[in-house]
Swiss-Prot record:
<feature type="binding site">
    <location>
        <begin position="71"/>
        <end position="76"/>
    </location>
    <ligand>
        <name>mRNA</name>
    </ligand>
</feature>
<dbReference type="GO" id="GO:0005634">
    <property type="term" value="C:nucleus"/>
</dbReference>
<keyword id="KW-0945">Host-virus interaction</keyword>
<dbReference type="GO" id="GO:0016281">
    <property type="term" value="C:eukaryotic translation initiation factor 4F complex"/>
</dbReference>
<keyword id="KW-0694">RNA-binding</keyword>
<keyword id="KW-0963">Cytoplasm</keyword>
<feature type="region of interest" description="EIF4G-binding">
    <location>
        <begin position="147"/>
        <end position="156"/>
    </location>
</feature>
<feature type="binding site">
    <location>
        <begin position="216"/>
        <end position="220"/>
    </location>
    <ligand>
        <name>mRNA</name>
    </ligand>
</feature>
<feature type="region of interest" description="EIF4G-binding">
    <location>
        <begin position="53"/>
        <end position="56"/>
    </location>
</feature>
<dbReference type="GO" id="GO:0005737">
    <property type="term" value="C:cytoplasm"/>
</dbReference>
<feature type="region of interest" description="Disordered">
    <location>
        <begin position="1"/>
        <end position="33"/>
    </location>
</feature>
<dbReference type="InterPro" id="IPR023398">
    <property type="entry name" value="TIF_eIF4e-like"/>
</dbReference>
<comment type="subunit">
    <text>EIF4F is a multi-subunit complex, the composition of which varies with external and internal environmental conditions. It is composed of at least EIF4A, EIF4E and EIF4G. EIF4E is also known to interact with other partners. In higher plants two isoforms of EIF4F have been identified, named isoform EIF4F and isoform EIF(iso)4F. Isoform EIF4F has subunits p220 and p26, whereas isoform EIF(iso)4F has subunits p82 and p28.</text>
</comment>
<comment type="function">
    <text>(Microbial infection) Susceptibility host factor required for viral infection (e.g. potato virus Y (PVY) and tobacco etch virus (TEV)) by recruiting viral RNAs to the host ribosomal complex via an interaction with viral genome-linked protein (VPg).</text>
</comment>
<feature type="binding site">
    <location>
        <begin position="171"/>
        <end position="176"/>
    </location>
    <ligand>
        <name>mRNA</name>
    </ligand>
</feature>
<dbReference type="InterPro" id="IPR001040">
    <property type="entry name" value="TIF_eIF_4E"/>
</dbReference>
<feature type="binding site">
    <location>
        <position position="103"/>
    </location>
    <ligand>
        <name>mRNA</name>
    </ligand>
</feature>
Amino acid sequence: MATAEMEKTTTFDEAEKVKLNANEADDEVEEGEIVEETDDTTSYLSKEIATKHPLEHSWTFWFDNPVAKSKQAAWGSSLRNVYTFSTVEDFWGAYNNIHHPSKLVVGADLHCFKHKIEPKWEDPVCANGGTWKMSFSKGKSDTSWLYTLLAMIGHQFDHEDEICGAVVSVRGKGEKISLWTKNAANETAQVSIGKQWKQFLDYSDSVGFIFHDDAKRLDRNAKNRYTV
């Protein structure tokens, strides 16, 4: 599904607005009287439900609470499942009600992964993968985060099956967006994903790809295996 189409799609919130407007247009009623929905309102709402646009996959938003992280011994134990969506309309409903990166507190991580894939190195789907990573000045990642989400859920990558999900990490000096993939050793697929991601975001700086295995062994000393 093209990004432009997704941006133009009516959200489910608008159906509720139509319902409210229809009721307001009715003649004035006595206090306590029940106002029945008109046929037009019911028909509109039915059409809205029937015309939702399904996505290729279901996706889940996860949130890693920085306060909880400081109190937990095990990495990932502070991860919380926020919301799972499977249609364009439900994505916008969730996105519009979740803080954008610039509004998150320092230390927070917001993830969006294919449903049933947890944003952890230990997840079986992620175990042999790696990450592409982009850096942004403080408060400047909102648009790139949205475009990353649209590219993922809109099936825009040629090697879409390689995509696990993405995470935006808010830190004191700025924000980072990481794109997680399945098979780090598949250089052709990873390089293609990295190049397309830069193109979707119109990102001019170089971006690097780190294997999860390297990150686990070497931590901050892990080096990029691929660069685009």
